[in-house]
Each structure stands twice: as C-alpha cells, then as structure tokens.
Amino acid sequence: MLRRWNIVIESLRRVHSSDLENLISASLYNRTLCTASESLNHGVVDESYVLAELSSLLPISSNKTSVSKEDSSSKNQVAIDSFLSAEDKLRGVFLQKLKGKSAIQKSLSSLGIGLSIDIVADVLNRGNLSGEAMVTFFDWAVREPGVTKDVGSYSVILRALGRRKLFSFMMDVLKGMVCEGVNPDLECLTIAMDSFVRVHYVRRAIELFEESESFGVKCSTESFNALLRCLCERSHVSAAKSVFNAKKGNIPFDSCSYNIMISGWSKLGEVEEMEKVLKEMVESGFGPDCLSYSHLIEGLGRTGRINDSVEIFDNIKHKGNVPDANVYNAMICNFISARDFDESMRYYRRMLDEECEPNLETYSKLVSGLIKGRKVSDALEIFEEMLSRGVLPTTGLVTSFLKPLCSYGPPHAAMVIYQKSRKAGCRISESAYKLLLKRLSRFGKCGMLLNVWDEMQESGYPSDVEVYEYIVDGLCIIGHLENAVLVMEEAMRKGFCPNRFVYSRLSSKLMASNKTELAYKLFLKIKKARATENARSFWRSNGWHF
C-alpha cells in the first residue's frame, strides 16, 4: 500500500499542476510517465496505470452527478412537454410501444390532462394511430371525468374508424355498445352505413341496414331513408333504386323517401327517372311538395332545359303551392349555370318581393356565381345585403369567396369581403389569410400586408415559411430591403429556410443597391439555414423526427 502511494505522489510531483487535468482526462497525452519508476523500481509506469491507482485510492461518489442528471433530464422533459398540445401528448403515449392495455392506460392517466370530447376527437381524427390504439384510447377516455359514455361519444369513434377504413374495429365498437349499456341510435347506424358507401362497399351497407335490429336500431322508415340518403349522396342511385323497389310493400314509404330518390336522379340529370319517381309518389297518395319541385328544377337545369324549369316554376302557384327558398335557389342556380346573371338577379328580387326569406344557400350561390362571372360590384352588393339581413357566412364560404377574387384583378374586392366578414364576427381560415397575403404581396400593398399579417397572428395562426416568403416578396417590391432582410432572418431563427427564388430576388436587389456587406452576411446565414434544412429533410426521409 505504501509503495502504491509513493508511486502516485512521485508521479504527481513530477507533473506540472496545469497538466494534471490533461493527464486524468487522457485526451492529450499518449506518452507514459517513466520518471517515478526509474527512482523506485526502474520499471515502466504508463499513464493508464497511474489513472488506475488514482481511481482506486481516490474514489469519487457518483450519487450527486446522477441526481443532477435526473434533475436536468426532468427539466428538459418539462420544457419539451410545454411545446406539445394535449392531443400530441396523448398520442405520444402510443409511440412508446408499451405492452398491455393496463400499462397504456396507466401512462395516459399519468399525464393529468383534463379531457373533453373535443380533445378525444382531435386525438382520434388526427395522426396515424392504429385501430387497436384508437379503441384502447377511447375505452380509457370514456372512463375518465369530462367524457360521458353516451351515443355522442361513440359516434366520434365510429366516424374516426370509418374514415380510416378500419371497418372490423368499427363493427366491434358498434356491437359492443350494447354490452357497455349504450343503445345505438339512427345516427350511429348512418355513420357506419355512410362509411361503407363512401368506399363503394354498397352491399355491406345494405347488409348492415338489414341487420340493424341486432344492434338495437329498429328497421323503420327513418332508417331506410338514411340508407337511401347515403346511397344517393354518394351517387349510387342505381343501387338505391334496387333497394327502393325491393323494400316496396315491406317498409312504409313517406314523402321523404320519394324526395331522396328524386334528388339522387336530379344530381345525375336523369329527367325520365325523376318523372317516374314523381309519378309513383302521386300514385302512393303523396303530393309533390316544394322540395320535390326544387329537385326537379335542378335536374332540368343540369340537362340544359331551362325553359322547362321556368314552366314548372310558373305552374307551382297554379297547383296551390307557394314557392319556398329551395325552389328559388334552384332557379337562381340554373340561370347562374347558364351565365344569365340578370335573370338570376331578377328571381332574387322576385323572391324578396314575395316575402320569401333568402337563406345561406341563396347568397352562397349568388355571390359565388357573380364572382366567378367577374361581376364583382354586384357580388359585393349582394354580400352586403347578406350581412345586413343577419346571414353570416361560414369559414369555408368566406374562403370560397376569396379564392377566385385573389386570382384576378387588384385585391380591393377581396379585402372588402375579408374586412366585412371579420367585422361581422366570422372566423377567417388560415388558407384565406395566405390567399390575401399572396395577393397583397404581388401588388406591393405592404401596409395592408403587414396589417393582415398581424391580424392573422392575433387569430392564433402561426407563421410558416410560406407566409414569410410573401412578406419578404412584398417588401422587396417596394424597396424596403433592410426590413425584408430582418423578416428573412426571423424566419431562419424559427427554423424556416425560404426558397431559392425568394432569396435570389432579395440578394439581387441588395447587390443592385450596393449593399454588398448586407448581402454577404445574409448569404452566410442562408447557407447555414439551408444546410440545416437539408439535414432535417434527410432525417425525416429516414424516419428520424426531431
């Protein structure tokens, strides 16, 4: 023991104190310490031997280090989790590949997330969970507070499974509802049938209807109408006709059954088939109503028989019926399709004179038709009337108005619709904001561009690389090159790399303005950002998501 201490002390004495750290780390020295051994036993004592003696004589406790590592890792985990939404955290549990449902449910419960049916719907509808994972998550969710085990909750999982064509899991959930004490209703049956029809599994949808009583859903006129509606809305009208004829006499039909068949043939423009169904409807003791006439008028319009549709419209009053909004909408749609905008406006004014209140479909067809026909002033006038009557457009409808307006002409009309919709309380979609930014950028309207950008961020939409490119382009057009560089640097700080065309345009303008130093600094930053982007693309192509 004394000899080992002497070797270590003699070695440390002959090494300069500044070189001690390098000696212990063994990273800078490959030569051995021979001086100590010459005076003691004339042997060779290498560096590894000295380090081994030090480690045995001076042990260092690793408890403190491990604790600090655990603390830092927990802090990092908290920092990472702060960037994740509740839906991503819940989906992330299934990425861990835990074995057993109990382990998965325990991990889900440990997250401590307050569940709601909206969060459950987001987890199921987004991402790429397997069918088994979706069912496992739903079984856990309905046992948690905040999510009730009722028909509404089960309709969410049925719709999510049907949308992804996971039909075996969908049928298991539908059959298991009764065992869980929840009786399926017509909505659940409709979701399942529509899921089959959507992927052209018509026979399975019909078989599901015939087996509906085994699920607790009565085979009635309402369920039969739901089957017909699923088939006709997906253009399987011939199959609907076969089922309609097969069930005639077994299931009592009502006027809705006949109207669904008429609407199906109307979408295909089959006037003769519509007339046959209308004749059967009258023979069965059901008089055609305004909905029947509206489908008939639409079908005639699709075949170009506008004059016949006008004749039917004029005969409605003679038969004791008063045209409603559906009938007027069909006439307006026919004339818009024929690009006869004056006649469509005449029927709209006639509708108001007859004190028939226009609905959202009326204004949707009018405004969209006038915009596509480039009757922008008339479209803006109708849009203002729409808002003045308290009819608010949906988010998707506002986007459909803005899309054609942002494809031709200056952005004035698009900005009018955007500002009035926003003022009325309508929510603007992210795609609508991008359409506006792109159009304003092209025309160099940077004041409006920056205002819309601020309003987009106020609405909760994050700025992606596409948005930054529009801003940089707009600033380049009006010559605000320094501001364009600042925006591009902000984009790179957020991990985005603008495309080569945007950078090339900005760099060329900087060089033309004798701002060589600024252009060179931007080049270095773009070079680094592009390398990072290429690395990220390589990671993702190999399945490494960081």
From Swiss-Prot:
Keyword annotations from UniProtKB, A to Z: Repeat
Gene3D superfamilies: Tetratricopeptide repeat domain
Superkingdom to which the source organism belongs: Eukaryota
InterPro entries, sorted: Mito_RNA_Proc_CCM1, Pentatricopeptide_rpt, TPR-like_helical_dom_sf
A Pfam family assignment: PPR_2
Repeat positions for PPR: 150-184, 185-219, 220-250, 254-288, 289-323, 324-358, 359-393, 394-428, 429-463, 464-498, 499-533
Family: Belongs to the PPR family. P subfamily.
Protein name (Swiss-Prot/TrEMBL): Putative pentatricopeptide repeat-containing protein At5g43820
Species of provenance: Arabidopsis thaliana
